[in-house]
C-alpha cells in the first residue's frame, strides 16, 4: 500500500469548509488536524488491543443466555428468510483447499489488513488519520461493550442445527475459539462481528482515499470476502454482520459529532482528485 495520493484540503492541514457540518462537540484544541506523534499512537493502539484481548478472551458467566440468544437469532433469520449461513457453510466445506484457506483468512487477515491500512493511513494521509482512526477505535470499543453485555454464541455452537466447525474438522488453527485453545478464549463474542467492523473500515478507507483504481476495487471487495468467510466458517450469523456494519456506522457518526468533520472526503471531490494527472 504505497501508492501516491494527491492531498485533499484536510490532508494538507487546512480546515474543512463549514457548509453542512455536524458538531463539533470537542473544542478546537482537542481536534487537531495533524497526525499524532508515533509513540503516542502506538501507546493508544496498544491500550485498545489490550482492552480488546481482555474483553474478547474473558469467559462469559452466562453461557446459557449466549446460546439462547444465538438460537433466537437463527429462528428470526429463518422467519425473515435470510438464513443463508448453513448453505454457505456446507458449500464451502465441500472444497477442502477453499475452507482451509478461509480458516486461515478468518484467523489472520482482520489483524494484518487493519494494521496495514492504519500504517498506510498514518504515512500517506496524515490529515485524515485522526478522524478515520477515531471512527475505528470508537466502533471497536462499542463492540467490546457488546461482547460484555450481549454475549452471543456462534452458529457452530448450535447443537442439532447442522453447522460444521470447520477448524475442528479440517485440523487448522483458524480460530482461537475452536480446537485445543477454546478454553482460553471467549467463545461467545459473536455479536457484533469485529471482522466485519474492521474489514468494512479498511475497505472504506481504501475505497475513499486510495488513488489507484485496483486498490479501491480491492477495498470494496474485501468486506464482501470477509462476510463470505465468517459465514462459511460458521463463526457468525448474518445478523452479527449487520450489527457490525451498524456499529461501524455509529463509530463514524460519533467521530463526526466529536470533530465536526467527515472522516472521508466527498465522493465528488475524491473522483476529481483521482482523475487529475
Enumerate the predicted regions with their spans.
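Alpha-helical transmembrane segments of integral membrane proteins
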Residues: 36, 40, 44, 130-135, ...
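Aromatic-anchored segments of alpha-helical transmembrane domains
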Residues: 50-54, 140-148, 221-232
Amino acid at each position: 500500500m504505497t501508492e501516491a495520493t494527491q492531498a485533499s484540503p484536510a490532508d494538507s492541514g487546512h480546515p474543512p469548509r463549514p457548509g453542512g457540518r455536524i458538531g463539533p462537540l470537542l473544542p478546537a484544541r482537542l481536534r487537531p488536524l495533524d497526525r499524532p506523534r508515533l509513540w503516542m499512537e502506538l501507546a493508544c493502539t496498544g491500550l485498545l488491543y489490550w482492552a480488546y484481548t481482555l474483553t474478547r478472551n474473558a469467559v462469559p458467566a452466562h453461557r446459557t443466555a449466549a446460546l439462547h440468544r444465538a438460537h433466537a437469532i437463527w429462528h428470526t433469520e429463518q422467519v425473515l428468510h435470510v438464513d443463508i449461513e448453513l448453505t454457505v457453510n456446507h458449500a464451502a466445506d465441500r472444497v477442502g483447499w477453499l475452507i482451509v484457506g478461509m480458516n486461515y483468512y478468518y484467523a489472520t487477515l482482520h489483524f494484518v489488513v487493519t494494521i496495514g491500512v492504519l500504517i498506510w493511513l498514518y504515512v500517506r494521509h496524515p490529515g485524515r488519520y485522526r478522524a478515520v482512526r477515531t471512527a475505528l477505535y470508537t466502533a471497536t470499543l462499542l463492540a467490546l461493550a457488546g461482547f460484555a453485555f450481549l454475549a452471543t454464541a456462534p452458529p457452530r455452537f448450535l447443537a442439532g442445527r447442522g453447522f460444521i466447525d470447520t477448524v475442528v474438522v479440517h485440523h487448522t488453527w483458524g480460530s482461537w475459539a475452536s480446537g485445543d485453545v477454546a478454553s482460553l478464549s471467549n467463545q461467545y463474542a459473536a455479536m457484533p462481528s469485529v471482522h466485519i467492523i474492521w474489514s468494512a473500515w479498511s475497505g472504506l478507507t481504501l475505497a475513499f482515499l486510495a488513488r489507484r483504481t485496483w486498490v479501491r476495487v480491492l477495498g470494496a471487495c474485501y468486506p464482501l470476502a470477509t462476510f463470505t468467510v465468517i459465514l462459511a466458517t460458521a463463526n457468525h450469523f448474518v445478523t452479527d454482520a449487520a450489527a457490525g456494519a451498524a456499529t461501524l456506522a455509529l463509530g463514524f457518526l460519533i467521530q463526526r459529532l466529536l470533530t465536526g468533520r467527515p472522516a472521508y472526503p466527498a465522493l465528488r471531490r475524491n473522483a476529481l482528485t483521482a482523475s487529475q494527472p
